[in-house]
Design a protein with these regions (language model features):
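Zinc-dependent deaminase catalytic domain
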Residues: 1-158
Length: 158
C-alpha cells in the first residue's frame, strides 16, 4: 500500500469518529510532516495532527480541527506539511465560518493538500477550493483508491 493510501486510510478512520448528521459531511484529516521536509530530522514521516468533522465545539470541519489542534503545539516550518483529507476542503461555508481552504492558505505551513474524494454539490455548488489552493501555490492531489469509502463515510446519516 502506498504512503498516500496509508495516510488517507488514517484520515478515513478519523472520519468514522464523526457523529453522523443529515446536514453535514463526515470528514477526516491527517497533517503529516514528510521525511526530508524542513524541520523533520527523523528518517520517517511525522504525523503532526488529526481531526474530524465536529470534533471541536461549534460547527467545525476536519481540516479546521486538525489545524487548530496543531496550533496549540509547535508549528512546522512554512510550506513543509501535507494535509490528507477524505473530502476536498471547503472553499465556502454556508455557516459564514472561515472556509477550510482559507485556513490552509493562511496557516502558511502546507505545501500539498491530498484529497480522497471531490466534494459533491449537496450543500455547495462548484467548490472553488482547488483553484484557490493552486493560486496560492499549494499543490492539490487527488489520491486514487479510496473514493468509494471516503464518499460513504462522508454521507453517513444522509
Amino acid at each position: 500500500m502506498s504512503q498516500d493510501l496509508i495516510y488517507m486510510s488514517l484520515a478515513l478512520e478519523e472520519a468514522k469518529k464523526c457523529v453522523a448528521t443529515p446536514t453535514a459531511f463526515c470528514v477526516g484529516a491527517v497533517i503529516v510532516l514528510p521525511r526530508g521536509a524542513e524541520g523533520n530530522r527523523k528518517d520517517k514521516d511525522i504525523i503532526l495532527s488529526t481531526g474530524y468533522s465536529r470534533e471541536l465545539p461549534g460547527n467545525t470541519h476536519a481540516e479546521q480541527c486538525a489545524i487548530e489542534k496543531l496550533i496549540d503545539d509547535e508549528l512546522p516550518p512554512l510550506n513543509s506539511a501535507v494535509i490528507y483529507t477524505t473530502m476536498e476542503p471547503c472553499g465556502e461555508r454556508l455557516s459564514g465560518n472561515v472556509p477550510c481552504v482559507d485556513r490552509i492558505i493562511r496557516s502558511g505551513i502546507f505545501r500539498t493538500v491530498k484529497v480522497g474524494v471531490i466534494e459533491p454539490d449537496t450543500f455547495i455548488k462548484d467548490n472553488a477550493g482547488k483553484q484557490k489552493l493552486e493560486a496560492a501555490g499549494i499543490r492539490y492531489v487527488h489520491v486514487n483508491g479510496l473514493e468509494r469509502e471516503c464518499l460513504e463515510a462522508a454521507t453517513r446519516g444522509h
